Amino acid sequence: MRCPSLTRLPYRAVSGLPRSVVRLQSQNFLTRRCASTAVLRSPTAAPAYQSILNKHLQQRRNASGTAAAVLEAAASDNLSQEAIIENLDPVEAGRLSRVRNIGIAAHIDSGKTTCTERVLFYTGRIKAIHEVRGGDKVGAKMDSMDLEREKGITIQSAATFCDWVKKDEDGKENKYHFNLIDTPGHIDFTIEVERALRVLDGAVMILCAVSGVQSQTITVDRQMRRYNVPRISFVNKMDRMGANPFKAVDQINNKLKLPAAAVQVPIGAEDEFEGVVDLIRMKAIYNRGPSGEELFETEEIPEKVKSTVEERRKKLIETLADVDDEIAELFILEEEPTEQQLKAAIRRATIGLKFTPVFMGSALANKSVQPMLDGVVDYLPNPAEVQNLALDKKRDEASVQLVPYQSLPLVGLAFKLEESNFGQLTYIRVYQGTLRKGANVFNARNDKKIKIPRIVRMHSNEMEEVSEVGAGEICAVFGVDCASGDTFTDGQLGYTMSSMFVPEPVISLSIKPKNNKDAAKFSKAMARFQREDPTFRVTYDVESEQTLISGMGELHLDIYVERMRREYNVDCETGPPQVAYRETIGNRVEFDHLLKKQSGGPGDYARVVGWMEPTGKLDDNVFEEQIVGGSISEKFLFACEKGFHLACEKGPLIGHKVLGTKMVINDGATHMTDSSEMSFKNATQQAFRKAFKESNPSVLEPMMKTVVTAPAEFQGDVISLLNKRNATINDSEVGVDEFTVYADCSLNGMFGFSSNLRAATQGKGEYTMEFSHYEKCPPQVQKELIAKYLKAQADRHKK
């Protein structure tokens, strides 16, 4: 669980602090999810307070060690981030200050994997560069699956680690350790981005210099905000025709509503792109060497960009003045900030989630990637500067701050599972303590004791064995039976961490192996895929006697069918795609239903009275009892609620789940001998079905946020295609050589759209879809769906 970005500290003492310290602490400190010491320290903090605090902490350090004292304070008082940072052991503080846990996220084809390939090359992690769609048949390092290399897309997030050497102002070299995750861009694999951002401290958001902010950029922005992840931005593809980096900067400000400003200005663009000018140090930076591995810096700024440099530096300072107090004060006094002041302000604002600095370059052309790596060091937080909260099960799940000290009891989160040749591989982020090979850990979900047989650091599909991993690091372990989102501790603490957001599937397919002898391998594959991917669901429909797989889109399911063939040698037959329809009640309907079966032996008797009505929102269903006088006992009401939720799983209209329906039971009757929990459960289900049909109910269909991009010459053809599918066009943008249209379309109407779009645009158009909301079906479509469902039921009864 992450804390809100800004909350005031409670007016309580850190175990044993004097009241004078508490008062000052309450007045002068704020807690943020991401905060450096510079962000948190109050300029008005009294020296007396600091003296008392230092003395008190020194006494504690002598008595029982800083780590234990801070753990005690964290458990009881929501310890401030400043106290954690300032009381780190110097060795530990030095280690953490040189760690960055970052992800690379962006829209499809923005160059994430190409950029990651350069990062690995420039940090010395790989010895040669290979392209995503390269002619050498090797493929990018981070695309380790054959399918990824064939299709030229990232399907699974891939983790690696590398070391970056950065020179400080004095020319001294400092080595920084990066734990890096490359994520997919396609919306069908959004869970990979979701779970990566859940455990990362910062991110690089990549944008295309031609297209700017695109549909999946908006999705990635939403995910970063969900987990309060600070980000720097990198405008890639500066060598492409039509490149306009400042359009991307404006779109970050306007579309994403996030203050942004360029910290670099490109020297040339398109095929004349040469390098960049650093607006903070006012130096021109060029790449040299066969792969751009050498950097050349000069204070001579080209004449052709001098006016742009002055204008954009002024814009940078103005934007920072809006989000940072120190720069605002200098701006009012009309004083020019120094290089150190600008860097400190950008760091504060970025970590405080109020700003994103924008870098520029071209990964494919090997230009200006290294300055972006310096930006990761300068502006993204280290693990000690990030506030992560756990829930203490021993204290009614009260929030408690995790402290990144290696000497404290272990707390780690399993965020991804993957099958390998050596068994199940579990990716873990260690938030507190140390994870050691051979140690026993406890799964907080089921209190199961587990031994850690092997710990590895991942480099795409390669691994490097290690004996231990400290707080703030990411690793993988073998032979651990767990689920994605499980919390691991060493058993001393009753902590658990909240899991990541998992979107609901929107599309299903019936599937079966072509050959019955492959049934065992088919079942094994299905179990593995479900364990690895929370958005991939497998169900068995008893009525149709079919296995159904559900996921985020056609590509998502096609990939798993293909993986079944390649990895398990199982050819499958699939049915046509099935839309995840929903049903909902129309009007308020009262019911008085009696279930009575008495034929000599034990009978059934249950009477339920009440009403059903819409909740007003198309989300969870609600059951409520308003019994007065005990006409139905508590255990039977429990059975009524169970019956209601079972009935909601399979609606009366077309057999799909019910949304936005409320049932209230306010009266009823029981029989001394014939009433049972089963009879009340059945009576509630019968009352539900009858009342639901009388309420003028509706079938709901999923509406998809659809974004189509194609060359401008095909605009009319694309609009015509969407209109034929009854799409609602919300907006469109026309660029120099391409246009983008934003629309809401029913998922049912979009089947086959991919091939039609290719035909209409000579293979040059592309589109993305993301679930938006549920909407009532057109009456004719609802009528057809109900008729089809009734016919299928009648056919089954004949059998």
Curated annotation (Swiss-Prot):
TM annotation in the entry: none
Write down the CDD domains for this protein, in alphabetical order.
EF-G, EFG_III, EFG_mtEFG1_IV, mtEFG1_II_like
Q: Which GO terms describe its cellular component?
A: mitochondrion
UniProt binding sites for GTP: 106-113, 182-186, 236-239
Determine if Mitochondrion is one of this entry's keywords. Answer: yes
- Transit peptide start and end: 1-34
Task: Please report any disulfide bonds recorded for this protein chain, giving both cysteine positions.
Answer: none
Any one GO molecular function term: translation elongation factor activity
| Keyword terms of this UniProt record | Elongation factor, GTP-binding, Mitochondrion, Nucleotide-binding, Protein biosynthesis, Transit peptide
Name the GO terms of the biological process aspect: mitochondrial translational elongation
Under NCBIfam families, the record lists: EF-G, PRK12740.1-5, small_GTP
Describe the function of this protein.
Mitochondrial GTPase that catalyzes the GTP-dependent ribosomal translocation step during translation elongation. During this step, the ribosome changes from the pre-translocational (PRE) to the post-translocational (POST) state as the newly formed A-site-bound peptidyl-tRNA and P-site-bound deacylated tRNA move to the P and E sites, respectively. Catalyzes the coordinated movement of the two tRNA molecules, the mRNA and conformational changes in the ribosome.
* Record-given protein name: Elongation factor G, mitochondrial
Q: What gene is behind this protein?
A: mef1
